[in-house]
Design a protein with these regions (language model features):
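A cross-taxon signal for low-complexity, glycine/charged-rich
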Residues: 1-3, 11-12, 17-18
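Membrane-interfacial helix-loop segments of redox and metal-homeostasis proteins
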Residues: 4-6, 18-377
């Protein structure tokens, strides 16, 4: 039997056995995760193209243009992700405590600093990693440079030349928290674990959803409402796929959801060294986002090849991608990985990293380090 065959089947009488002609194959946990990642990424890519879902565009529209619809879309996505993820955890379907976001030991300064770098780099490149994948699918060749440079600097920070510096910074500032999440803080105040989880999730998700829907223009934008709902559910879908559908005691996989720093770096490595690499949820999500955007762009007539206007434009965009790659690794995620997926766990570390991203973005859009927009979105 070849390595690509699925080694089991379900017969008409319910028996399970070896692969046979005419029988229905049974997907194992690994294959379920791969297919789920492709589907989730595809939908995210399509929604991202149609709605313009992007933290940078949201903040720029809110702060500079007075248009608060996109930031409400992002807030709704976070609120839905928090509610759905915490319901999965409360129901015992997914153990989010196994994720990288809920570690008891982390470096607050490094995560915040990484967020600052990522946020400022996002302004320089005029979009985050996930947005670059969406734009690449639409034919934006500038985004190809962003994706490749981001991947290279992420690998350099994870395992390469920058890694020793990162490790030294973490080692000098790492601390162990008695509570690593908002529910844990409430539980420390005397609430039961379940009550603490439900209270924290209810208050935070309700506040975000109310913030979204009190805006009249947002309520009159069904496309933006749908985008926020779908993206929030995609985050929960990723948790469900890796933490429940793909759970396997004999072949455990990381419990995770949408994020676009290490996965973009891993995807580039897989493209170059596929015989020595293994597909995982993050890699196929990256491929799925590109495919979803490409198919949607072709079907809707949005596909158009675009390039850089000047060498300076390319240098600035590539520099921003480098900051995003290095900063995203230090922050353990990006505007999606920490701003949506990490935030959905209510982890304190994710909130610190996301705060850094917001401050870095503000510095680029409004602060002393302000830079003008580029035509890359």
């Amino acid at each position: 039997m070849s390595s690509t065959e699925i080694p089991s089947y379900v017969s008409n009488d319910g028996r399970v056995g070896g692969t046979r002609s005419g029988e229905v194959p049974v997907l194992d946990g690994g294959n379920i995760i791969i297919l789920s990642g492709l589907l989730i990424g595809f939908v995210y890519g399509s929604v991202g193209l149609l709605s313009g879902f992007c933290l940078l565009s949201s903040l720029r529209g809110w702060w500079a243009d007075g248009d608060g619809r996109l930031i409400r879309t992002y807030a709704l996505a976070i609120g839905v992700a928090v509610a759905a993820t915490q319901l999965l955890a409360a129901g015992g379907l997914v153990d989010i405590g196994k994720s990288i976001y809920l570690q008891s030991s982390f470096s607050m300064p490094v995560m915040f600093f990484g967020g600052l770098l990522f946020g400022y780099g996002m302004v320089l490149s005029n979009g985050c990693g996930s947005r670059a994948l969406v734009l690449l699918g639409r034919g934006n060749l500038r985004s190809f440079v962003v994706v490749v440079v981001l991947a290279i600097f992420a690998q350099m920070t994870l395992k390469g030349l920058i890694a020793p510096t990162r490790i030294a910074m973490v080692g000098a500032s790492q601390s162990t928290a008695t509570a690593n999440s908002v529910p844990a803080l409430l539980a420390g105040a005397g609430l039961s674990a379940t009550a603490a989880r439900m209270l924290a999730a209810s208050v935070i998700s309700a506040a975000l959803i109310i913030f979204a829907f009190v805006h009249p223009a947002f309520r009159r934008s069904p496309g933006q409402v749908a985008a926020g709902l779908v993206v929030g559910l995609l985050v929960a879908g990723g948790w469900f796929a890796t933490g429940y559908l793909g759970a396997d005691d004999f072949n455990p996989v990381p419990v995770t959801s949408l994020t676009f720093i290490a996965p973009i770096a891993d995807a580039l490595q897989y493209v170059m060294l596929s015989t020595g690499s293994t597909l995982n949820f993050g890699i196929v999500t990256v491929f799925g986002v590109f495919a979803g955007s490409l198919v949607t762009a072709l079907l809707t007539g949005r596909f158009q090849l675009e390039g850089y206007r000047s060498p300076r434009h390319m240098l600035r965009s590539g520099g921003g991608a480098a900051l995003m790659g290095a900063g995203g690794v230090m922050a353990f995620g990006c505007s999606v990985g920490q701003g949506l997926t990490g935030f959905s766990t209510l982890a304190l570390a994710s909130m610190i990293a996301f705060a850094g991203i917001l401050f870095g973005t503000a510095a680029g859009l409004r602060g002393a380090l302000r830079v003008g927009p580029l035509a890359t979105a």
